[in-house]
Design a protein with these regions (language model features):
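N-terminal targeting or regulatory segments adjacent to alpha/beta-hydrolase or S9 domains
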Residues: 1-81, 89, 94
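Glycine-rich active-site/cofactor-binding loop and its immediate structural neighborhood
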Residues: 74-134
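Mobile cap/lid helix-loop segments that gate and shape the active-site cleft of serine hydrolases
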Residues: 189-200, 207, 212-213, 250-292, ...
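Active-site loop->helix "elbow" adjoining a glycine-rich segment at hydrolase catalytic centers
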Residues: 202, 234-237
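Alpha/beta-hydrolase fold nucleophile elbow
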Residues: 222-234
Length: 314
């Protein structure tokens, strides 16, 4: 790095990380499960879910009519139908999505997955396989981001939403940009600044919206809710973790690139996206505690040795 001649070089810094690590070690995970029986675990599960909902800011979330609207229907090659649907997740708060519906193989209801998006993929556009958009095509090739389309090709209905701050749900800071970066990225940072002083969180809003999406699946009534799955990569994995932990209507889930320990992945790596951070969460639980609320439902986790977001211990 080129040395500037307008500053002085600091030989030693007095940062806060060591003190924060010590506080984490002293105060973290006070509500971890300490029982020994299934009955104790079931009681802990219910109490923990209520604690998590409070931490996420769900007491401020408002339910409403879903008011679903089909805005577009496109017939794709290989027989897949792509619907663009918008639902209302809170009063005057809307979630657009693509629904990929493959041809039916039999008379029974089709199996269904929520395919939740992560960062750098323009929300639903990558997950639903919009490779006709050059920037999205590059993200699909780099991250294998089109898992919604891949599910549809395997016979599953894939519901691919824009979570808050992504795609068509970007907030004002990135709405006017016509550049590729604005299109692909999200406004999680801006959402966090709006939400947290009100007692809400980005993770809480995204989890609420995913649960409302399940409401829509049930209300629509066309697909098999007895085997409802959720899958997500990176930030989509975060959403998958939370909604699966809090909503028993999720029957199976796949988390890719998001199951860490908070000390390594979000305290040491403290430059991660604002959507990861929930005030007071670390006092109560680590991420594994949240994941344990999914049991006994099936959970598959993909985690890679070279994923730098795992933290220094890999």
């Amino acid at each position: 790095m080129e040395q500037a001649d307008t500053i002085i070089q600091i030989p030693h810094f007095y940062g806060s990380l060591k003190g924060m690590q010590d506080k984490f070690d002293k105060y973290a995970r006070q509500d971890a499960f300490t029982g020994a029986t299934r009955e104790e675990w079931e009681a802990w599960k219910e109490t923990s879910r209520e604690t998590l909902k409070d931490l996420l800011g769900w007491k401020y979330m408002e339910s409403c009519d879903l008011d679903p609207r089909v805005e577009e229907v496109v017939e794709l090659e290989n027989g897949i139908r792509r619907e663009k649907v918008i639902i209302q997740v809170e009063p005057e708060v809307y979630m657009p999505m693509y629904i990929l519906i493959p041809p039916k193989q039999d008379e029974g209801k089709q199996k269904c997955f929520l395919a939740l998006p992560g960062h750098q993929g323009a929300g639903k556009f990558s997950v639903a396989g919009r490779d006709d958009i050059p920037a999205v095509k590059r993200m699909i090739e780099f991250y294998h981001y089109d898992y919604g389309m891949q599910l549809a090709k395997r016979g599953y209905v894939a519901i691919c939403p824009d979570c808050r701050g992504f795609g068509e749900r970007r907030d004002e800071a990135l709405q006017k940009g016509t550049d590729e970066k604005s299109f692909l990225t999200s406004t999680c940072f801006h959402l966090a600044h709006m939400a947290e002083p009100l007692g809400e969180t980005v993770a809480g809003m995204c989890t609420w919206d995913a649960s409302r999406l399940i409401d829509y699946v049930y209300e629509r009534g066309e697909w098999d809710t007895d085997d409802l799955g959720v899958v997500g990569f990176s930030g989509g994995g975060m959403q998958t973790l939370w909604v699966s932990a809090l909503d028993d209507r999720v029957k199976k889930c796949i988390i890719s690139g998001y199951l860490y320990g908070y000390r390594d992945a979000l305290l040491l790596l403290n430059g991660n996206c604002s959507c990861n951070y929930v005030p007071h969460l670390w006092e109560h639980f680590d991420m594994g505690d949240i994941a344990s609320l999914i049991a006994p439902r099936p959970l598959a986790v993909q985690s890679c040795r070279d994923d730098h977001l795992n933290g220094p211990r890999g």
